[in-house]
């Protein structure tokens, strides 16, 4: 194996896919065949060098776009390759997109927190009296919880306001009802942005090599990786579990977690504070309900729906049949970011959930923009990327079915058998300099 990876698409299920990997020394699927056709464009020799600059094509570009004409059009005449420099993307975005409006942010927070209070305080007692309402109440309240998560998500990035204290307060208020420790999650999430689609440094959904999959606890594989119910159980497991064999990034509730091994010392203290707010809210949910059965109806059911939303949205943003990941020697920030996908969920979902679904490419490149600026920023980024064939946007109005189908087909597998452009060659495309 070369140590280079991209997400594998296979018709087999997740465990069966890795069974093939064990027997052949690599994981393969239909997309691998398409990528082999693209290798003529990449034209990377076994030595890792290419015969001419025009033949170098960074492997992050998805297979349907991997043709010489795309590479030639993008690089010809202007001295620029198909992959723009980060500065070019940032300069294309109106400056006001990077300026949070605290009053506007507070307005959205008040609306979403008010809706959540209404769901828990007004609607949930009615569910106890009329259990037939549960199939409506659980997904509705879970969606409102997801809306609050996006508000806290802005706080974690510092894009809610320029006031760090206000960001921390609103972040904890919006995250505690979701049992998400605000500061630890903000820390790990920043690593996810910093190293998006890096095979070993990315945080969130694990990128699974055959070796890592085999080293993962079988119970964790059963509960979180291999089956449809992982969409409901994966996120709480990710936050809770500490042991390396769980394939998480470390517990977000435990101040001694390996998550903070390279973090500033105060992150462990902040972890204790954030975890305490979650435990406190969880205690309130038990105190406010009459029995375990009522608690399951009033809180657990919508919580699991929220967990599904978080899994589904983040999974679909970063996984598709042609998604690529990168090992240490070939990863580059813009290349990793270009694997992000803007997905239109439709039915008012994109608007209700603050465009976290359909404006995610711009957000992943520049996380310091508040959610209400993302539409304008997306239009600007799209204007740079789309003419070069680098912008990924999918109509995903079948998002429920798509989540389960894609997870079954793609899982978290990676493939390691295709020649790649080297980091130097990739940088040459970005800067417009020859790699010869």
Where are these regions (language model features)?
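PEST-like, low-complexity acidic/proline-rich intrinsically disordered segments
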Residues: 1-18
């Amino acid at each position: 194996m070369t140590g280079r990876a991209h997400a594998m698409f296979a018709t087999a299920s997740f465990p069966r896919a890795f069974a093939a990997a064990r027997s052949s020394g690599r994981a393969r699927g239909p997309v691998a065949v398409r990528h082999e056709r693209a290798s003529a464009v990449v034209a990377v020799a076994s030595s890792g060098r290419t015969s001419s600059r025009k033949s170098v094509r960074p492997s992050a570009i998805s297979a349907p776009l991997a043709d010489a004409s795309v590479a030639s059009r993008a690089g010809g005449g202007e001295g620029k390759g198909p992959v723009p420099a980060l500065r070019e993307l940032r300069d294309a975005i109106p400056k006001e997109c990077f300026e949070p409006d605290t009053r506007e942010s507070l307005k959205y927070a008040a609306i979403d927190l008010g809706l959540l209070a209404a769901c828990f305080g007004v609607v949930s007692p009615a569910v106890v009296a009329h259990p037939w309402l549960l199939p409506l109440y659980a997904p509705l309240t879970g969606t409102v919880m997801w809306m609050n998560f996006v508000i806290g998500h802005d706080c974690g990035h510092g894009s809610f306001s320029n006031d760090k204290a206000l960001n921390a307060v609103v972040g904890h208020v919006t995250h505690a009802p979701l049992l998400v420790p605000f500061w630890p999650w903000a820390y790990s999430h920043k690593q996810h942005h910093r190293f998006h689609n890096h095979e070993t440094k990315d945080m969130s959904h694990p990128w699974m090599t055959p070796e890592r999959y085999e080293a993962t606890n079988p119970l964790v594989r059963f509960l979180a990786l291999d089956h449809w119910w992982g969409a409901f159980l994966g996120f709480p497991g990710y936050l809770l579990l500490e042991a390396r064999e769980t394939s998480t990034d470390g517990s977000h509730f435990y101040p001694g977690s390996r998550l903070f091994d390279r973090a500033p010392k105060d992150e462990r203290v902040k972890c204790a504070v954030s975890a305490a707010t979650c435990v406190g809210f969880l205690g309130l949910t038990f105190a406010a309900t009459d029995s375990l059965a009522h608690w399951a109806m009033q809180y657990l059911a919508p919580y699991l729906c929220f967990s599904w939303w978080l899994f589904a949205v983040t999974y679909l943003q970063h996984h598709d049949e042609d998604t690529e990941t990168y090992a240490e020697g070939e990863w580059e920030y813009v290349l990793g970011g270009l694997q992000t996908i803007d997905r239109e969920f439709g039915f008012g979902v994109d608007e209700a959930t603050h465009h976290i679904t359909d404006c995610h490419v711009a957000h992943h490149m520049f996380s310091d923009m508040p959610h209400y600026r993302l539409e304008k920023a997306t239009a600007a980024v799209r204007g740079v990327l789309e003419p070069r064939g680098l912008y990924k946007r999918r109509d995903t109005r079948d998002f429920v079915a798509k989540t389960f189908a894609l997870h079954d087909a793609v899982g978290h597998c990676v493939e390691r058998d295709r020649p790649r452009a080297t980091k130097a060659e990739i940088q040459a495309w970005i800067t417009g300099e020859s790699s010869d």
